[in-house]
């Protein structure tokens, strides 16, 4: 049972809150702690403490304004924008008037988009056959493709044989945020109503249980949960069909999975966290069009992951680099951020960065479950597209092309059903089952099926290297046609071992030239939130972080978060520690919601426009 917020009069605590971005965490060494003090209230969000029982909300006008549309799309990423563009293309071609509204939680289109990104352009060219004439930002065709295995000191080159997923011939290195921004312009030119800075916070339902639309979040709420004088209720958007294109681990999709039991016939999703930086490097080290991928060091063979280093041709010697770490890792002492910083010091990586300048940083979770983890995609009144259900081709390290194609197929399926209905009617919750059928008959389904066994093959005794052997034998020869389907090992949060069973990892200190601390890194993400609002990182039980996560796992949230949101600080009275949530640091990666071993953290949307401000990430 939660208790009232303890009085926090400590001067150090006030200093912490005076900073906009906080330090990563206070080191707890290998000791697990428990607290003798009363558990302070951490969570004040109305999703945990309903406002109808709070006297401070008595007399507040809770009426919401409602708008009607034919289609509402949640999320302006590659999938959502592809659906929006294709719907309006079809409407123009068939001389139909369809109202399409798209809401995006970022302040600008593309500001929350982060990917490698090496783009397979097939679906993009299908959507925009005249992309060159329209000036789409595909500036860097791949000219060189390399793959290697890293040991601590050496790089072992591995040939990329024709037909293997890693082959990038014909692809483009892109800054996906810029591409998404360009797609947003095309959508608006076609008549799509695009609303950046509006965060979809709630799914609305008809009396019959079908999806009615969404509501954006309320704004003007104090940190303690009380209404401000500037309080405004969110907006309701009703539609015949609502498309959920939130990206990986969307918070509304989580609700829909439970409401409609969409995961009844699939395996749990498994995830990775991708950390990325942009650097301007010395021109003599610049190889425009080069794509370089590695596996191995600094991760052990039982920790799935790999790195990328892409040389962009953007008018300056720019490289995009990053590390992906599978979130099914077992050691609670592992820090994906610090593994990334350590990786940059490898003898095959460091020379590229020496003399350069880091200009951007960010992180985002990504789906790795593949074919086995795809849920049911349609339900009365709505459907899922893109990285929300998870169409990433993991060995190919690409999901943008499949996300775009899913958006195109969704739009075509919806248009067919909309135009067979009376567009002037307020049809209740159209169930567009044709979309799932069309997807299963497309190249997306065939592609994901062919690589379905590669990611789970890494769970054997040989780990990642066993997966490489499996890929070389079965994928290269049989092209994924083996008569069996391997399974994943369960949910990622279940894989974490107790701290007593693991060895703490000693990471080298950052040198400030190649590797950096978390504080300076988060600053480069541009992340910003209104400070005086309830933390959007909500806890179902405020006592669990200390009494379970810290006690058993030595507080893994302070290490798996790539933005320093979670830290354990000394209590003001008594012995031990308490969890402090620095919500303004959050880059919306969703890792905490995925990896928390107690599944106590629930990520909800903050006020619209908050979060990272990525520029072409």
From Swiss-Prot:
Transit peptide residue numbers: 1-33
Residues found modified as N6-acetyllysine: 96, 132, 223, 357
Cofactor remark: Binds 1 [4Fe-4S] cluster.
Subcellular locations according to the entry: Mitochondrion inner membrane
Outcome when changing residue 334 to P: In GA2C; uncertain significance
Enzyme class of the recorded protein, top EC level: oxidoreductase
UniProt: FAD binding residues: 71-85
Residue intervals of the 4Fe-4S ferredoxin-type domain: 577-606
Alphabetically ordered keywords of this record: 4Fe-4S, Acetylation, Disease variant, Electron transport, FAD, Flavoprotein, Glutaricaciduria, Iron, Iron-sulfur, Membrane, Metal-binding, Mitochondrion, Mitochondrion inner membrane, Oxidoreductase, Phosphoprotein, Transit peptide, Transport, Ubiquinone
UniProt-recorded Gene Ontology molecular function terms: 4 iron, 4 sulfur cluster binding; electron transfer activity; electron-transferring-flavoprotein dehydrogenase activity; flavin adenine dinucleotide binding; metal ion binding; oxidoreductase activity; quinone binding; ubiquinone binding
Catalyzed chemical reaction(s): a ubiquinone + reduced [electron-transfer flavoprotein] = a ubiquinol + oxidized [electron-transfer flavoprotein] + H(+)
Entry's EC annotation: 1.5.5.1
Residues at which [4Fe-4S] cluster binds: 561, 586, 589, 592
Known function: Accepts electrons from ETF and reduces ubiquinone.
Protein name: Electron transfer flavoprotein-ubiquinone oxidoreductase, mitochondrial
